[in-house]
Design a protein with these regions (language model features):
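Glycine/proline-rich active-site loop of Rossmann-fold NAD(P)-dependent oxidoreductases
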Residues: 1-5, 12-17, 33-34, 42-54, ...
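C-terminal "lid/loop" region of Rossmann-like NAD(P)-dependent oxidoreductases
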Residues: 18-19, 52-54, 62-69, 77-96, ...
Length: 140
């Protein structure tokens, strides 16, 4: 969300065309929050089993760099520079972790519905709308 927010602020002229980033080589498994909320809803409404545990998450994995490249390809501004800030680097970064959602899928029939590309487009559009609806938007 930080990258999408920064891109939207650059597009609105509220930030110089420099994107502040951390480690772009980390691998992440991505899931749309709308899919996660749907999973949580199903968890409590479809035959919940007290004390049972489930993994919920996405199955699409890529590097943070690939995710950023995708967001930049959606930007209305070309030539945005990337600047690594040491305070954004984690002292220890986990290797790729992909949740095994088999048990939850078998119990509920749930599966992620919203693809990575749509998630990234919607995320950038959200920040564009939020920033453009209030030019006095405070960067936090």
């Amino acid at each position: 969300s930080s990258f999408a927010k920064q891109i939207a602020m650059i597009e609105a002229g509220l930030q110089k065309p420099v994107l502040k980033v951390g480690n772009l080589d980390s691998l992440r498994t991505w899931s749309d929050v709308r899919d996660a909320v749907n999973a949580y809803y199903m968890l409590v409404t479809i035959d919940p089993i007290p004390g049972e545990y489930y993994n919920i998450g996405g199955s699409f994995s890529c590097s943070v760099r690939d995710m950023l490249d995708h967001l930049l390809s959606l930007s209305k501004v070309q030539g945005i520079k990337i600047e690594v800030e040491t305070e954004r680097l984690r002292p220890i970064d986990a290797d790729l972790q992909v949740p095994d959602t088999t048990k939850f899928k078998n119990h509920t029939g749930w599966k992620p519905e919203i693809g990575f590309e749509k998630t990234m487009q919607d995320l950038l559009d959200y920040w564009r709308q939020r920033i453009n609806s209030n030019k006095n938007f405070l960067s936090r």
